[in-house]
Amino acid sequence: MSNCVVLCSGGINSTVAAVHAARERDVHLLHIDFGQVAATAQRSAVHDIAQAIGCDTIDIDLPHLTAIAKLHRHANGPSGEHLDSTNQSTPKLTVASVPLLMAELLGIGIQTAIRMGAASVIIGSSEAASEAESEAGPGNGAAYLRQDYYYLFSRLVEMSVSAKNPVHLETPLIDFTRDEIVKIGSRFDTPFDLTYACKTDLGTHCGTCIDCAARHRAFNAAKLQDPAMAAAR
């Protein structure tokens, strides 16, 4: 059975991708803390998911990104700040707010796969979902979620990794909308109750942020109950 590394945030997409991969491969769930607000809750969810589907976890922290974010904050004022539980101002990071962050995350995934002897890196990105949810309309989804982004990154990997031990980048959900991904996950008995997709680090879904709203719409469109959101009420 071949090995694979799944970049996992603990959210729906990456969990569905992991469950699907675990049917035929040994899976390593990779969680990366790059300074995102929900990092602690995400990591806890990833560990719970790993235990449920029978795979191991790899945790990596990127403290240098917090330092970079502080430089950005000083240059642009308080708009990029939030107050943590100690009322101290800390950088608020997202994949969208840090240039080239997705490329860095993918690079870490590739490096991890090489060290683990894994043949592939899997990410649950969905261009279809990004396009559907873009406030600017069709054709204006996030560039780092587009299929051609991963195609170009794959070419870079091919040029950088030994041909004797290639590592392939897989995006199995790239063409599926969020509700379609929920339906796929349901067919594979995905432990949705363990997933976490919220902008906060509360450990339970706040129900009001944009990630919670997108999750709610997806389950409604799929005509399925969301066990994680139900538990948070």
Where are these regions (language model features)?
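Local cysteine-cluster metal-coordination motifs and their immediate loop/turn environment
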Residues: A103, G107, Y196-R217
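Short cysteine/histidine-rich metal-coordination sites, predominantly Zn2+-binding motifs
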Residues: D201-L202, A222-R233
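A polyampholytic, Gly/Pro-enriched intrinsically disordered region
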Residues: T190, H216-A221
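Short, intrinsically disordered, charge-biased short linear motifs at domain edges
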Residues: I184-R187, F192-L202
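Structured loop/turn residues at beta-strand edges in well-structured enzyme cores
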Residues: M116, D193, G207
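ATP-dependent adenylation/nucleotidyltransferase module used to activate substrates
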Residues: M1-D189
